[in-house]
Amino acid sequence: MHIISKAPFEECARKYPNDALALHSLYRVIKETDFSTPEEMRTAFPNLDNFKYRNKWYVLDVGGNNLRVIAYINFVNKRFFVKHITNHAEYDKLTRYYRENKE
């Protein structure tokens, strides 16, 4: 898939060095694999889940469930755009924000 920017992965790896290896691994697998459907992506990432407050946004757990990647994924055009990489406390705040501020 085409990852729009590597910068969020690099920034998060600096911020959370204990999870840097997991972030780089996630980046590499997504970049090297063309997933056609969410179901196909779940074979590599069983924790992939819909982010129910935005269309085509998905959540991936990273680093033994320490971090969450929220991304817009277009499976037809093979595009992966990171919206947020954050810890669980921030994820809860973002979920609350998006729940209260519909598109």
Curated annotation (Swiss-Prot):
Question: Record's GO cellular component, any one?
Answer: toxin-antitoxin complex
Q: Which top class of enzyme applies to this chain? A: hydrolase
- Annotated Gene Ontology MF terms? endonuclease activity; RNA binding
Q: Which UniProt keywords apply?
A: Endonuclease, Hydrolase, Nuclease, RNA-binding, Toxin-antitoxin system
Which InterPro entries has this protein been placed in?
Toxin_HigB
State what the entry records as the consequence of deleting this gene. Deletion of the higB-higA operon has no effect on virulence in mouse infection; the disrupted strain is as virulent as wild-type.
Q: Does the keyword Nuclease apply?
A: yes
What is one Pfam family matched by this protein? HigB_toxin
Q: What is its EC number?
A: 3.1.-.-
TM region(s), chain numbering: none
The subunit structure is: Probably forms a complex with the antitoxin HigA which inhibits the mRNA interferase activity.
Q: What functional role does this protein have?
A: Toxic component of a type II toxin-antitoxin (TA) system. A probable translation-dependent mRNA interferase. Probably counteracted by antitoxin HigA.
Q: Which family does it belong to?
A: Belongs to the HigB mRNA interferase family.
Protein's UniProt name: mRNA interferase HigB
Species name for this entry? Escherichia coli O6:H1 (strain CFT073 / ATCC 700928 / UPEC)
Gene symbol of the encoding locus: higB
